[in-house]
UniProtKB/Swiss-Prot annotation:
Name of the gene this protein is made from: bioF
Residues that hold substrate according to the record: R24, H137, T356
Coiled-coil zones: none
Subunit comment: Homodimer.
Keyword hit for Transferase: yes
Cofactor: pyridoxal 5'-phosphate
Organism: Stenotrophomonas maltophilia (strain R551-3)
Enzyme category, top tier: transferase
Catalysis: reaction(s): 6-carboxyhexanoyl-[ACP] + L-alanine + H(+) = (8S)-8-amino-7-oxononanoate + holo-[ACP] + CO2
Enzyme Commission number, as recorded: 2.3.1.47
Record-linked PANTHER family: 8-AMINO-7-OXONONANOATE SYNTHASE (PTHR13693:SF100), CLASS II AMINOTRANSFERASE/8-AMINO-7-OXONONANOATE SYNTHASE (PTHR13693)
Protein name: 8-amino-7-oxononanoate synthase
Length: 407
């Protein structure tokens, strides 16, 4: 039997994506000014960034990065366990741990690497299992597979389903993992109920709160907003690249768990540390997120305005009170057509299609920032309603005429 040819396979897969209209392409941003982006020579108002608090270009954050780069250079020079753990890394870990009420934190280059590190280091023996929400982020789901553990999934937000899956896997050590805020739906996991499930089933409860920290509750994220602590959620992940406007991620947890990760997690051990200048920028962003409550207040007001205007225009909202506001379109073609129509009108909103979301659940993913104005929010909603009407009319006109009726 002939060995499969990888090049032929990838060409076949690409042809299939072409046929399905699911090719992914990058857009090059030439310049950025707050929520305004220059793309292909056109200035657009963006509603697709994760810069929820508007800190990515904030003056003191950028200044902290520049000052640290002048002192420390462009890179860390080594992995954390060799000689790459700088004072700025330590200061950032301590600040975030103190803010979120955890004993310790461990800094990673990305949330994807951090999720892999947690599962690879902890789910290390045969029959170990990770039980997850079906709509968890790809990095959580992929981490289980890459760690070699068993993956069992429960229906979205279904705590009884989580309990059943844990009961059906009694032989190995168990982890119950969930997003805090779900990145494509914008809803929040029932963390208090899930923490009880984990406790009853002797599973370690792990929350990826990438989209919650800085935004949910008083800014400490979904775990704190649910009234939970390290005793309930022994490990949680927060990213620096969403509300905090930078890059990287931290895993927070009990002393014994963080020490174990530092000593055994391969994505931590075998990679160069984040540049100290990036840690300096993140540290300043954390301090602003803790201090500038007006950013969250304004963001909350903009979310309420968006939902009110969307309902007034009859748009199909999902149940989200976070900056992630998906508008269901159903089929891929409608989502892409509406995104294209919005861009032609001066708005940048991403069309999200399978496999990122389930089949038949293609959507526009609107994300709001404290940098947006009420006028921009109203303008976007009106533009979405106009795009919906245009696309609906085009589909109707392209449909074949009905067959004649017979008596």
């Amino acid at each position: 039997m002939a060995r499969p040819d990888l090049t032929a396979r990838l060409h076949a897969q690409r042809a299939l994506r072409d046929a399905q209209g699911r090719r992914r392409t990058r857009r090059t941003v030439t310049r950025r000014d707050g929520v305004r982006l220059e793309v292909d020579g056109q200035w657009l108002t963006g509603f697709c960034s994760n810069d929820y608090l508007g800190l990515a270009q904030q003056f003191s954050v950028v200044n902290a990065l520049q000052d640290a780069a002048a002192r420390e250079g462009a890179g860390a020079g080594a992995s954390h366990l060799v000689c790459g753990h700088h004072a700025m890394h330590e200061a950032l870990e301590r600040e975030v741990a103190e803010w979120l009420g955890y004993p310790r934190a461990l800094l990673f280059g990305s949330g994807f690497a951090a999720n892999l590190a947690v599962q690879q280091a902890l789910l290390s023996e045969e029959n170990d299992v990770c039980v997850q929400d079906k709509l968890n982020h790809a990095s959580l789901l992929d981490a289980t597979r890459l760690a070699g553990a068993r993956l069992r999934r429960y229906p979205h937000l279904d705590t009884e389903g989580a309990m059943r899956q844990l009961k059906h896997a009694p032989d190995g050590a168990a982890m119950l993992a969930t997003d805090g805020v779900f990145s494509m739906d914008g809803d929040i996991a029932p963390l208090r109920a899930l923490s009880l499930v984990a406790r009853l089933q002797q599973a370690l409860f792990y929350v990826d709160d990438a989209h919650g920290v800085g935004v949910v509750g008083d800014g400490r994220g979904a775990v704190a907003a649910a009234g939970l602590s390290v005793d309930d959620v022994p490990l949680q992940l927060v990213t620096l690249g969403k509300a905090l406007g930078g890059s990287g991620a931290l895993v927070l947890g009990r002393d014994d768990l963080i020490e174990h990760l530092a000593e055994t997690a391969r994505p931590y051990i075998y990679t160069t540390a984040v540049p100290p200048a990036m840690a300096a920028a993140a540290l300043e962003a954390v301090r602003l997120a803790r201090r500038d409550h007006w950013r969250r207040t304004k963001l909350t007001d903009l979310i309420a305005l968006f939902r009110s205007e969307a309902r007034r225009h009859g748009l199909d909202l999902m149940a989200s009170e976070t900056p992630i506001q998906p508008l269901l379109c159903g089929d891929d073609h409608t989502a892409v057509a509406m995104s294209t129509a919005l861009e032609q009108a001066g708005w940048l909103v991403g069309a999200i299609r399978p496999p990122t979301v389930p089949e038949g659940k293609a959507r526009l993913r609107v994300t709001l920032s404290a940098l947006h104005t009420p006028e921009q929010v109203r303008g976007l909603v009106e533009a979405i309603a106009n795009a919906r009407d245009r696309v609906t009319l085009a589909v109707r006109e392209a449909a074949p005429p009905p067959l004649p009726a017979f008596a």
